[in-house]
Amino acid sequence: MVQQKVEVRLKTGLQARPAALFVQEANRFTSDVFLEKDGKKVNAKSIMGLMSLAVSTGTEVTLIAQGEDEQEALEKLAAYVQEEV
């Protein structure tokens, strides 16, 4: 298991389209992927779980991955949320 704290820099946070793209990217990996905010941990492959966190720009979250491709999943997803687009 690997984990990393990251600051979400997406202009709209993880809302609507960015959240859908994040979930789509997370589903490309075989590892289990989770996102944690303020002690609430959700499956990052679930759009409903991700939306329930209400992650806005500037929010610090913890990405957690466990499985065969955990390191690659963590790196790609961390890079995605840290993009300033």
UniProtKB/Swiss-Prot annotation:
Modification Phosphoserine occurs at: 46
GO biological process: phosphoenolpyruvate-dependent sugar phosphotransferase system
Top-level taxon: Bacteria
InterPro entries for this protein: HPr, HPr-like, HPr-like_sf, PTS_HPr_Ser_P_site
Record bears the keyword Phosphoprotein: yes
Domain HPr: 1-85
Family statement: Belongs to the HPr family.
Function as written in the Swiss-Prot or TrEMBL entry: Along with seryl-phosphorylated HPr, phosphorylated Crh is implicated in carbon catabolite repression (CCR) of levanase, inositol dehydrogenase, and beta-xylosidase. Exerts its effect on CCR by interacting with CcpA.
Quaternary structure and partners: Mixture of monomers and homodimers. Interacts with CcpA as a monomer.
Family annotation (NCBIfam families): PRK13782.1 (NF010354), PTS_HPr_family (TIGR01003)
Miscellaneous: Not phosphorylated by PEP and by enzyme I.
Protein's UniProt name: HPr-like protein Crh
Gene name as annotated: crh
